[in-house]
């Protein structure tokens, strides 16, 4: 495991014989049934609630602002490599609903309140945010400007 991966993930806390979730990469000519996952962990979160609702388990995960900036209602997030849909969001946490099959086939089945998890946000959102901020990095000669202020200055808004 690369040093950057150790720094950004829960791997530092892994114990001998502890399970991890591994999934094969999607083939380029296969059915696209989820969101684009690069396998690059953006940060970690902590499960703060786990509740059964009918046939689903609802997990609520607390995450740092650096991750929450990319978490949107009905958007996608990967928890320990498992692609899921966000059903609720607050400033510091989000919730996902997991079906029994997913719980049985992944390490989330043994996750409990307090479990630290790896999080990866949707790569499309990361690219959009990056491109929206291009040219707005502050320098001595040029103070930081938002994309909105640039659009207004140039007559687009």
State where each predicted segment sits.
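Conserved loop->alpha-helix
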Residues: 1-157
């Amino acid at each position: 495991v690369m040093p950057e991966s150790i720094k950004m993930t829960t791997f530092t806390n892994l114990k001998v014989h502890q399970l991890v979730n591994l999934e094969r990469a999607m083939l380029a000519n296969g059915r696209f049934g989820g969101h684009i996952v690069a396998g690059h962990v953006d940060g970690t979160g902590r499960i703060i609630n786990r509740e059964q609702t009918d046939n689903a388990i609802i997990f609520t995960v607390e995450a740092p602002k650096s991750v929450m900036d990319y978490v949107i209602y009905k958007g996608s997030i990967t928890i320990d490599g498992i692609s899921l849909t966000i059903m609720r969001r607050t400033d510091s946490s989000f919730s996902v609903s997991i079906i029994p099959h997913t719980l049985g086939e992944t390490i989330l089945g043994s996750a409990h309140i307090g479990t630290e998890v790896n999080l990866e946000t949707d790569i499309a959102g990361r690219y959009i945010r990056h491109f929206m901020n291009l040219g707005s990095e502050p320098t001595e000669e040029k103070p930081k400007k938002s994309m909105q202020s640039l659009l207004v200055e140039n007559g687009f808004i």
